[in-house]
Amino acid sequence: MASIALKTFTGLRQSSPENNSITLSKSLPFTQTHRRLRINASKSSPRVNGRNLRVAVVGGGPAGGAAAETLAKGGIETFLIERKMDNCKPCGGAIPLCMVGEFDLPLDIIDRKVTKMKMISPSNVAVDIGQTLKPHEYIGMVRREVLDAYLRDRAAEAGASVLNGLFLKMDMPKAPNAPYVLHYTAYDSKTNGAGEKRTLEVDAVIGADGANSRVAKSINAGDYEYAIAFQERIKISDDKMKYYENLAEMYVGDDVSPDFYGWVFPKCDHVAVGTGTVTHKADIKKFQLATRLRADSKITGGKIIRVEAHPIPEHPRPRRLQDRVALVGDAAGYVTKCSGEGIYFAAKSGRMCAEAIVEGSEMGKRMVDESDLRKYLEKWDKTYWPTYKVLDILQKVFYRSNPAREAFVEMCADEYVQKMTFDSYLYKKVAPGNPIEDLKLAVNTIGSLVRANALRREMDKLSV
């Protein structure tokens, strides 16, 4: 292990004594594969003298890991603060194929390559999805504790200082270009002690600390609606595990969630069974039981090896940026409705934000300001806002009742729907449609919704 003592720079200081060093793993040889950033030579902000720009990334999930790596590669003195190095988040763990390539992820951190999905309606009608996938295409299934640790390690290899600590609060700058003072509790993983209070001064902060973000609270970023996700990891027999070898299941219905879905996703040697809800959080365990019952025959005899719960944001925060502080990932609210996807968008937003800082600071040589970080938000909104709006509409239309969910599952049987859905999901690009097929899809959608509404009216009559 290599012991690295943080240096004291003019205008910035760390309150801990010089001999209170931070221990990091030795960096491995690193192959630089990231694309070059275009640096504007007309920057008018002051140069940073005698040191490089200092940035703290709070939170070590996909957003924080991707941000810290990009910053460190770009010449920024980077500090990544993560409170729990083995954190297991209740996350389905699905990642799109494009993320594997964009973030150079090794295949050995992917537990399963899902090529088949079953969408199961409230009446247990199952539709097989994945017929249009090409031989090389798949949805990757990962464990968050594995993915997150890998991205943090890569950030450390790029030069970031990874600190095991709990972020407490942040003192705002007292003058233009003055530092932010971060207060955190530093932990020693060897002693498992109560921790030591420390401070760190930095020029900018990236808040990647999740749905309960303390960085967001520090800049009064505002609240948002959130879902509660509940997940159990269940160890099942080898013969039952073969069924889920490359298959994931999604269950819809009022029994598993009034506004989301239940899932069974395969991991390395177990399955993750979970559900979520925004409107009925107190009933989450009831919905989880219903999800298990729906999948009962396929997971019977399984042993629960871990139980996890966590909030999931439902829309972006009212404020995602203030001065030299920006929010990314769940802290910013970047989780899609309808699907609940967040891993890719977290990592992508972390990278985008870091790129804006690297570019604005001219590889760490100049101070950044809010206009530099705002470029990240402008690029993000232009690229992904339409995706969020479309999925928001889909959730409102198809998740509002059991008849609507039946119509949704019926639509999923259409190969054109599957192709458009998978192409958009796997590559995060709006797939070009066929005008004739689009017209057929519109007619079929209307027909499905008409049948769903007729069914709902009949069910309402029977309930009177």
Swiss-Prot record:
SUPFAM superfamilies reported in the protein's UniProt record: FAD/NAD(P)-binding domain
Major localisation: plastid
Transit peptide: 1-54
GO molecular function list: FAD binding; geranylgeranyl diphosphate reductase activity; geranylgeranyl reductase activity
Broad class of enzyme this protein falls into: oxidoreductase
EC number: 1.3.1.83
A GO CC term attached to the entry: chloroplast
Reactions the enzyme catalyzes: phytyl diphosphate + 3 NADP(+) = geranylgeranyl diphosphate + 3 NADPH + 3 H(+)
InterPro entries: BchP_ChlP_pln/prok, FAD-bd, FAD/NAD-bd_sf, Geranylgeranyl_Rdtase_fam, Geranylgeranyl_Rdtase_pln/cyn, Geranylgeranyl_reductase
Pathway where this protein functions: Porphyrin-containing compound metabolism; chlorophyll biosynthesis; Cofactor biosynthesis; tocopherol biosynthesis
Keywords: Chlorophyll biosynthesis, Chloroplast, NADP, Oxidoreductase, Photosynthesis, Plastid, Transit peptide
Annotated disulfide bonds: none
Domain of life according to the entry: Eukaryota
Subcellular location(s) per record: Plastid, Chloroplast
BP terms from Gene Ontology: chlorophyll biosynthetic process; geranylgeranyl diphosphate metabolic process; photosynthesis; phytyl diphosphate biosynthetic process; vitamin E biosynthetic process
Function: Catalyzes the reduction of geranylgeranyl diphosphate to phytyl diphosphate, providing phytol for both tocopherol and chlorophyll synthesis.
Family from the record: Belongs to the geranylgeranyl reductase family. ChlP subfamily.
Identification of the protein by name: Geranylgeranyl diphosphate reductase, chloroplastic
Protein's organism: Nicotiana tabacum (Common tobacco)
Gene name for this UniProt entry: CHLP
